[in-house]
């Protein structure tokens, strides 16, 4: 009598070359710098999964998604002179603007207008500190001006999915009306650093 083979969970046909992905979580939901450090270690470890140009310094881009650190953003926005309020009462957007001052300022103003038209309140901008010295020449030539924009949750909108839905709509309207700015993320829960 022939024994029937049980199907295995592993199937070699699933194997193929592609970008790598990693995940680091604190199962208790506690936000720590250690989680960020571990995520960056994964990014470094998966370097072989990303594309690079001939010079070996310019990659095809990588990023990490994090929970918004309210304590961090509370501190930096107070230093900038505006109040973001309580946790989940605001959204943070990560924007890649052109370096050209006129185009950058036009895009920023357009976002502020769209936010207001969507019934939200724009709070302020923050320039994100960067370290261009680690970039290859090609990446340096294309490096955007990176800023974060802060948007306040209206009192009549619930925290969570309702507010994030309004942020998503504002983001999509902005993206469709502006072709020189990339929005990495805009949320009250998470932020993407690239």
Predicted segments, located by residue:
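N-terminal segments that mediate ammonia production and transfer
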Residues: 1-194
């Amino acid at each position: 009598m022939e024994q029937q083979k049980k199907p295995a969970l592993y199937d070699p046909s699933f194997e193929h070359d592609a970008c790598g992905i990693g995940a680091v979580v604190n199962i208790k939901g506690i936000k720590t710098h250690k989680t960020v450090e571990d995520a960056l270690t994964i990014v470094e470890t998966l370097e072989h999964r990303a594309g690079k140009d001939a010079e070996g310094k310019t990659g095809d881009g990588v990023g990490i998604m994090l929970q918004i650190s309210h304590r961090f953003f509370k501190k930096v926005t107070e230093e900038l002179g505006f109040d973001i309020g309580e946790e989940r009462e605001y959204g943070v957007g990560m924007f890649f603007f052109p370096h050209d001052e006129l185009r950058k300022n036009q895009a920023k103003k357009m976002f502020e207008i769209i936010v207001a038209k969507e019934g939200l309140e724009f709070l302020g901008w923050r320039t994100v500190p960067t370290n261009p010295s680690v970039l290859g020449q090609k990446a340096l030539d294309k490096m955007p001006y990176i800023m974060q924009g802060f948007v306040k949750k209206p009192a009549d909108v619930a925290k969570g999915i309702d507010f994030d839905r309004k942020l998503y709509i504002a983001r999509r309207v902005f993206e469709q009306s502006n072709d020189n700015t990339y929005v990495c993320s805009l949320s009250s829960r998470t932020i993407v650093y690239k």
